């Protein structure tokens, strides 16, 4: 199911952990509405400005999946209001460009979000996602 020009519901609910553990990671109607807002108002504008594919490493998480991956009990992922993303190359340099694009869009008022976190945003150190 397409939620925006470049993003699908399947991308936002996909989880290797859920598959391995037999967890059904399906949003309810309110969570689906939130995911649609997330894609149309935040992710798609980022993708359009960045001009290259963006990979969603974690989107919606049901309660059971969130517990399994050690997510915070009040995580926005539980409500369909958060996504961890990175570039297709997942290099420091490309992720830095993506991060800078996001900050620019936020500063211009094009996107509105509560948090922007660059996890392990140091060259050659640990996982990289925004």
Model regions: which residues?
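Extracytoplasmic cell-surface/polysaccharide-interacting catalytic and binding patches
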Residues: 1-47
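Structured loop/turn residues at beta-strand edges in well-structured enzyme cores
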Residues: 52, 80, 111
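Active-site microenvironments of hydrolase-like enzyme catalytic domains
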Residues: 69-84
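Extended, low-complexity, intrinsically disordered C-terminal regulatory tails
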Residues: 41-70
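A broad, low-specificity signal marking well-ordered, structured residues that form hydrophobic/aromatic
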Residues: 54, 83, 129-130
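Catalytic cores and adjacent binding grooves of peptidoglycan-active enzymes
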Residues: 74, 87-130
